[in-house]
């Protein structure tokens, strides 16, 4: 057996309706002013407002930034960083799929340490802990709530850059299966395939370890048994929760097994389909 090491220094809450614990978790982070980051689709559905109101009801100030596209760009990170600084917030809530979480991680770096996110491309270039980050996934796909990666599109190079550092791991993650129920079938399918491939790639990686293998095996089991059921009925909370936990385990597995990434400007799972 090759030498390996691992650390999962996060606080993860899993459960139906666990979004209600956001104010409690926010206070644990030590923050009093949230910068809530999401995408326009969730904003239109009223879910961003719901999350913001839960924080406000606990006496926490909130500013929102919802101008985040799929496969987010360096320019979006720059805009979000400027908005964060202008708001005067002291912690970040990433609410959505992989794109808001990737941008939130990047903003956690650039708002604290300055410069462009391009300056942190590569491995272990983030000098220290980022601004406190709470990640709340609304898809079972990227597992970004537990990964040490942020993937951002650099249009000047027509390239997706990757920041890899354990410093950008969200301090807290909330996994509420009820948030998955509004996803269209096509999105649920693509995200589920993305998560399964994360686990599969981690399992066959030359950098795999007994730890990442255990995570990958459980992820493939949960996703394989539940993806068809969930895509057919997104209101099936039991299947949704299994997919969400499978995605979580897959994210941990591929974060530690250091697998490949898709570089085309399309959802990864959709490319595989």
Protein language model regions, located:
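N-terminal beta-alpha supersecondary unit
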Residues: 37-46, 70-71, 206, 213
């Amino acid at each position: 057996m090759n030498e390996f090491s691992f650390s999962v220094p996060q606080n993860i809450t899993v459960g139906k309706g666990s979004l209600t614990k956001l104010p409690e978790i926010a206070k644990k982070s030590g923050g009093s002013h949230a910068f809530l980051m999401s995408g326009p689709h969730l904003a239109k559905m009223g879910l961003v407002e719901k999350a913001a109101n839960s924080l406000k009801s606990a006496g926490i100030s909130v500013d929102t930034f919802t101008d985040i596209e799929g496969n987010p760009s360096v320019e979006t990170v720059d805009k979000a960083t400027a908005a964060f600084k202008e708001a005067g917030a002291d912690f970040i809530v990433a609410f959505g799929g992989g794109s808001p979480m990737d941008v939130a991680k990047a903003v956690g770096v650039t708002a604290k340490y300055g410069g462009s996110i391009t300056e942190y491309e590569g491995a272990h270039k983030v000098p220290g802990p980022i601004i406190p980050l709470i990640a709340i996934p609304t898809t079972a796909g990227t597992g970004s709530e537990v990964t040490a990666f942020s993937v951002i599109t650099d249009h000047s190079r027509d390239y997706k850059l990757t920041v890899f550092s354990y410093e950008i791991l969200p301090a807290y993650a909330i996994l509420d299966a009820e948030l998955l129920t509004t996803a269209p079938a096509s999105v649920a399918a693509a995200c589920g395939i993305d998560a399964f491939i994360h686990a599969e790639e981690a399992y066959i990686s030359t950098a795999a370890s007994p730890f990442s293998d255990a995570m990958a095996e459980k992820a493939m089991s949960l996703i394989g048994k539940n993806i068809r059921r969930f895509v057919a009925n997104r209101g099936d909370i039991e299947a949704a929760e299994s997919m969400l936990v499978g995605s979580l385990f897959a994210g941990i597995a591929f974060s530690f097994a250091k697998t490949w990434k898709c570089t085309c400007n399309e959802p990864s799972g959709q490319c595989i389909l």
